[in-house]
UniProtKB/Swiss-Prot annotation:
Protein's name according to its UniProt entry: Hydrogenase maturation factor HypA
Keywords, sorted A to Z: Metal-binding, Nickel, Zinc
Function: Involved in the maturation of [NiFe] hydrogenases. Required for nickel insertion into the metal center of the hydrogenase.
Domain of life: Archaea
Native organism: Ignicoccus hospitalis (strain KIN4/I / DSM 18386 / JCM 14125)
One MF term in the entry's GO annotations: zinc ion binding
Gene3D superfamilies: 3.30.2320.80
Coiled-coil regions, chain positions: none
Sequence positions that bind Ni(2+): H2
Binding site for Zn(2+): C75, C78, C111, C114
Family membership noted in the UniProt record: Belongs to the HypA/HybF family.
Length: 139
């Protein structure tokens, strides 16, 4: 379950940012992240892990806003573009592997138009903390 490692990274990164900016008496109310579709992150599991890892910190009780970035592939040979959803039936058996190693999806894909294996992942592997919102703490 790599959702736990994502959650820990989110908490650690925001805590570092708070310390760096001298924001010691604040309560984080929202954390905004973008996660690529190819990571196959379960938003419920991620939120649960975030909730657990943020206990006792300024992030406790913060909303975790998750934007899932859709995948996009392009064939280097013919230029055709497509998404993960377009080829999901062919990749269904490999979902557990893709879940753990999203970068391997490139090795499992062929262009649906020309059948070339020269495929580039344009988007869908992101993990970005876009920002966070906070308010002054009463404590």
């Amino acid at each position: 379950m790599h959702e736990a490692s994502y959650a820990l990274t989110i908490v650690d990164t925001v805590m570092e940012a708070l310390k760096k900016e001298g924001l010691e008496n604040v309560k984080v109310t929202k954390v905004i992240i973008k996660i690529g579709e190819l990571s196959l992150v379960d938003p419920v599991a991620l939120r649960n892990a975030f909730e657990a890892y943020s206990l006792g910190s300024p992030l406790e009780g913060a909303e975790l806003e998750i934007e899932v970035v859709p995948s996009k592939f392009v064939c280097k040979r013919c230029g055709h573009e497509w998404t993960f959803k377009d080829v999901y039936p062919e990749l269904k058996a490999n979902i557990p592997v893709i879940h753990l190693y999203p970068h391997l999806v490139k090795d499992l894909l062929k262009c649906p138009k020309c059948n070339s294996s020269e495929v580039e992942i344009v988007q869908g592997t992101e993990f970005v903390i876009e920002g966070f919102e906070y308010q002054e703490s009463n404590e």
